[in-house]
Amino acid sequence: MLTYSVAIRTLGKSPETLRTELESLHAQTVKPEKIIIYLAKGYERPSFTVGYEEYVLVNKGMVAQRAVPYDEIDSDCVLLLDDDVAFERDSVEQVIKLMERHNADCIAYDTFENHKMSLKSKIRSALVGFVFPRFNKRWAFKIHWNDSFSYINNPGRGCYPSMSAAGPASLWKKTALRAMHFEHELWLDKLEFAYGDDAIEFYKLHRNGGRLMVAFDYGISNLDAKTSSGQYHRSVNRFKTMAKANTIRWHRSQYLPTKSKAKAVLKTVSFSFKMFWTLGLLAMMSVKKTYRKAPKLFVEGIKDGMRYTKSAEYKSIPPYLMK
């Protein structure tokens, strides 16, 4: 059986949630060889130790705390985790067996359960975020030309090929993880919040020929600490951050890798329609005080994103497609 070690990124702000996660890891039927906690520099290390976990200080950032060489780990696989999930006792063992059976490079747990949203929430997600359900099972999550995604509507318990995935928990073959060079995506950490970091990372594996899959109903609980995302959602600048991140991410992962000029035009039209639609919705919502500045900030974000894609810094980033 493939061996694995655990890599957790954290700021240490939710120690009890982290404790619950560590307890569930130490209780696994197949034990991890190591549990490495990548703690952002300048943040206090939790005072407790559940078992044999080790702490490594790294630069702060959603991407930076994943874009490490993992020199501390010699296992076949790395279980990448946020600090707010917990597992049933045989969860990791089952996913390792899935990885061996399907010869996958990465299997991510479905932690956000889009398919379980209420009908009202599904309609809202489709209208506001262009995120909609799909009724075939070809892909767990499919990325579209406008950089939005669709999700399988009724997966049941199973494991499906995917173009993207949720970021809180994923089992990677170490060779595939290192080959993705997440350090090339550190531009995301320069935003107020690394909006869409999981999408840019998982889709990169898919676009570069890796086999990504998503496991549904395989014994994971999302404890949802929201230490970083909570700050983002409370920020008045979130609309600007979202627009800027979406613009850069679309340009990097959709537009630039497209060799066909006709397809590039269609992708541009698709993305432009999405952004104009979102702007129109924000304009209607701006009658509320909390959304008063949203349209202006959204436009500023698009402009900032377009400006960045023309910068020398952006042009110096290695290509998204690496082969």
Stretch-by-stretch model annotation:
Residues 92-135:
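Conserved donor NDP-sugar-binding/catalytic core segment of glycosyltransferases
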Residues 165-167, 188-203:
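Acidic donor-binding loop at a coil-to-helix junction in glycosyltransferase catalytic cores
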Residues 78:
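Short aromatic/hydrophobic "clamp" motif used to bind/position activated sugar donors
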Residues 8-27:
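Short, well-formed alpha-helical segments that are part of the catalytic scaffolds
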Residues 211-289:
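Active-site-adjacent helix/loop segment of glycosyltransferases
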Residues 75, 166-181:
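Conserved nucleotide-sugar donor-binding
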Residues 57-73:
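Glycine-rich, basic loop-to-helix element that forms the pyrophosphate-binding segment
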Residues 139-172, 193-194, 229:
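A recurrent flexible, glycine/aromatic-enriched loop bordering the glycosyltransferase active site
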